[in-house]
Amino acid sequence: MEFAQLVDDPLKHVCRVLVVGCYVDGFRGRFFDDLDEALGGGLSSIYEQREFTGELNKVKLLNTFGKLPAERLLLVGLGNNEELNSDRLRQAAGAAATALRPVGVRKLSSILHLARDRGAETLTATVEGFALGSYSFDEYKTGKEPKTDLEEATLLFAEAGDLDYNVNKVLAETATICDAVRFARDLVSQPGNVLVPSYLAEKGREIAARYGLSCTVLEREEMAQNSMNALLAVAKGSHEPPKFIILEYRGGGEDDAVTVLVGKGVTFDSGGISLKPREGMEKMKDDMAGAAAVMGTMMAVAALKLSQNVVGLIPAAENLPGGGAYKPGDIVRSMSGQTIEIVNTDAEGRLLLCDALYFAQRYKPAALIDIATLTGACVIALGNFATGLMGNDEGLTRSLKRAGEVSGERVWELPLWDEYGELMESDIADMKNAGGPSGASISAGWFLHKFVGKTAWAHLDIAGTSWEEKGRPYRPKGATGVGVRLLVEYLRGLK
């Protein structure tokens, strides 16, 4: 999707649709009275007749019948003026994009971003809402009508004084990040018979070639040479070979710090021998959403040319039952040398991650962040509205919380007390791979922290935020691409 800025009077601007933000509390907002007058009191009449109230995310499409150069106005509810923030504005823009899809509008103009005098922050939220709210995935539908998704949005500025910051830079950077989110959504949306580990590796090579990253893919033999036995154990039940994808971006100096991102890449999770219930298993194609987030983040970091050194590690495998599958009761020696008793083959993501986290130590990272659809328990604890956060470094977790608030991809920190380690104790190995239902999200995080040494580390559990069952304004039903905006915001905040 493309974005442009234009200094023009909204009352004189020629366009198919002009998006206008409206409130519920009597606060008219900028340009409301002028537009109302041009329409002969039409906007006031709509409010009086309760056809539209300004309620958050509610929309009303009006034909101007030639009274304005804009053919139609799309009124978008912003709720109460005093409660308007960036995420509400992001939602409103997403609601506008969603409402225009069935109408077949490919281009719009907007003064929605002028509803709140916050400069770049407001513009960013508006652009994100339009770009992410207009997303759809219909690659496999046959006999479909041509797509009518939004392709272009013009952000109007009534006067040069509104341009007290580099608008074009904000538009370009925000569009770049949203492209990366859409890329991640596309990956997660692919069916499991298409997106296998080798497909994910090929996508890594493609973005590396396009954006100037280096890409290395370790095959099964090289993983064995590196003693990645936990990862390889998970892959044993599938005919699809596992892949270990390494993406490197060197935007900083040779001696500058390195941030390593690790994304869980279970391209389909049946649970293995500890088979999942039939109901909902088709959604287990999204168990590589962490890998998609890391790949999308690496794409955005390179496109933005950040002055950082960033490495993305993606352990990719399928978890299936089969004649060679790993079994409950097996003991696996991880790359770190620590032994793991397998009590549940459906607790497989942490086995991929533990070898990847240990491998990451080779880069001597200043910060190590893993992101994974790790536990159903996190969905129970936080629902679909926040990503679970754990870590061993207060500065790192604080930075991720800040990035979550700015990006709208909020996180909530859970404790990582030693007592949770008692749940993972094994009689015959160094630890078990699962500790039962009590505190399951935290015990999973505790398991991971055993493989990071003294490195500053954080774990993001996106099991609840990677997929939308019903859809929300800028997060349509399906894959959300969560993690990309959060991680990019974190990386942009590094000194």
Swiss-Prot record:
Q: Name one GO biological process term.
A: proteolysis
GO molecular function terms listed in the Swiss-Prot or TrEMBL record: manganese ion binding; metalloaminopeptidase activity
GO CC, sorted alphabetically, is:
cytoplasm
Main subcellular location: cytoplasm
Co-factor remark: Binds 2 manganese ions per subunit.
So what EC number does this one have? 3.4.11.1, 3.4.11.10
Give the first-level EC class, as a single word: hydrolase
* Needed cofactors: Mn(2+)
Give the signal sequence positions. Answer: none
Positions with a binding annotation for Mn(2+) 1: 269, 346, 348
Q: Per its UniProt record, what SUPFAM superfamilies does this chain match?
A: Macro domain-like (SSF52949), Zn-dependent exopeptidases (SSF53187)
Please state which protein family the record places this protein in.
Belongs to the peptidase M17 family.
Protein name, UniProt field: Probable cytosol aminopeptidase
Q: Which organism is it from?
A: Geotalea uraniireducens (strain Rf4) (Geobacter uraniireducens)
Please spell out the taxonomic lineage of the organism that makes this protein: Bacteria, Pseudomonadati, Thermodesulfobacteriota, Desulfuromonadia, Geobacterales
Encoding gene per record: pepA
